[in-house]
């Protein structure tokens, strides 16, 4: 705990809840976070199962909270045995300074060390998802940040504080109002079908090999989400070799915000390089629109070749985020 005559860095406590909520509501939108009613901010942040005052710190000036930082830990979080997760930092404009950032980061990082963590991380593995507004859109939003937005002073401050940017993720977006699968993609689908691979919506009574395909992809998050979608009967576009599942995109799930959600696109190794990823993504967008989604947004690595697929479907980059790690 840091303390000077009128300045104190300390753990937050339940008695600080109203002050923390007020700080968030007044200042988080400046970072691009979506505006939410108090009760919704509580659900997303201060009452979230992973929220803990043990990993929340306040800068107080003459007894008044002027900034706070929040993180979380959990051995069930991917890499959680060695990593603590940075969640957010909000500050009054007069106190939104490099000094405040360093003081709060120091406090959070020390708490991670005490908990036995060796790394402080800002990644999409953080289970506390805070929605943000998509620039230039009519109020559309994405449901979480995978890092620190590169347009924020916080990004440079964290790099200066010893964080390493391991990669950058770009947020891509398009509305679905005028979306339609173009003729050239339809033609590609016909050529691919002639070569033995077709597209369909997953039907457990007709299609097999979903589990084997997921096992080959070796992505635990995809396995959990796609298996649950198939079990629950959600719309799941798949690529087929005969009746064997060769790949997936989805599942199709319009969120209450109007966003078409999906876990990802995966093609089994033996069926790659046949344009199936592109065909599935175009089909996914059509199914999301049919199900009532009005827009889609997603993240991809700035150097990920899949970015070309998204761009060919009319998606544009709207914001870039740095994935940050620091060895403690």
Language model features: what each stretch is:
Residues 2-45, 56-58, 169, 184-221:
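Short amphipathic alpha-helix that is part of the acyltransferase structural core
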Residues 2-3, 97-193, 322-326:
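Acyl-donor-binding surface of acyltransferase catalytic domains
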Residues 25-56, 61, 69-80, 217-269:
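A conserved beta-strand-loop-helix scaffold within acyl/acetyltransferase catalytic domains
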Residues 67, 167-170, 247, 319:
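A structural microfeature
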Residues 96-113, 267, 273-286, 290, ...:
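Conserved acetyl-CoA-binding loop-helix of GNAT-fold acetyltransferases
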Residues 120-123, 262, 296-300:
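Conserved hydrophobic beta-strand within the GNAT/NAT acetyltransferase core sheet
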Residues 158, 310-311, 315:
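Conserved active-site tyrosine of GNAT-family acetyltransferases
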């Amino acid at each position: 705990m840091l303390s000077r005559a009128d300045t104190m860095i300390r753990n937050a406590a339940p008695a600080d809840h109203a002050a923390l909520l007020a700080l968030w509501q007044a200042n988080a939108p400046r970072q691009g976070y979506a505006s939410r009613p108090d009760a919704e901010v509580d659900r997303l942040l201060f009452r979230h199962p992973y929220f803990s005052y043990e990993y929340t710190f306040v800068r107080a000036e003459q007894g008044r909270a002027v900034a706070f930082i929040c993180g979380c830990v959990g051995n069930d979080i991917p890499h959680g045995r060695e990593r603590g997760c940075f969640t957010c930092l909000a500050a009054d404009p007069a106190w939104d300074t490099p000094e405040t950032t360093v003081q709060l980061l120091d406090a959070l990082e020390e708490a991670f060390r005490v908990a036995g963590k060796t790394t402080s991380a800002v990644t999409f593995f953080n289970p506390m998802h805070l929605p943000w507004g998509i620039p230039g859109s009519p109020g559309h939003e994405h449901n979480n940040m995978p890092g620190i937005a590169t347009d924020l002073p916080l990004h440079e401050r964290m790099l200066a504080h010893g964080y390493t940017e391991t990669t950058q993720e770009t947020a891509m977006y398009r509305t679905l109002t005028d979306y339609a699968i173009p003729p050239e993609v339809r033609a590609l689908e016909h050529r691919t079908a002639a070569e033995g691979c077709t597209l369909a919506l997953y039907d457990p009574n007709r299609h097999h090999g979903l589990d084997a395909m997921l096992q080959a992809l070796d992505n635990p998050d995809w396995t959990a989400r796609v298996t649950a979608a198939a079990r629950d009967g959600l719309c799941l576009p798949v690529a087929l070799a005969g009746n064997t599942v060769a790949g997936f995109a989805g599942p199709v799930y319009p969120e209450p915000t109007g966003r078409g959600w999906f876990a990802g696109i995966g093609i089994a190794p033996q069926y790659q390089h046949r344009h199936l990823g592109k065909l599935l993504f175009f089909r996914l967008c059509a199914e999301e629109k049919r199900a009532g989604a009005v827009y889609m947004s997603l993240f991809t690595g700035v150097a990920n070749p899949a970015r070309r697929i998204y761009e060919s479907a009319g998606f544009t980059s709207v914001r870039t985020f740095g994935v940050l790690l620091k060895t403690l």
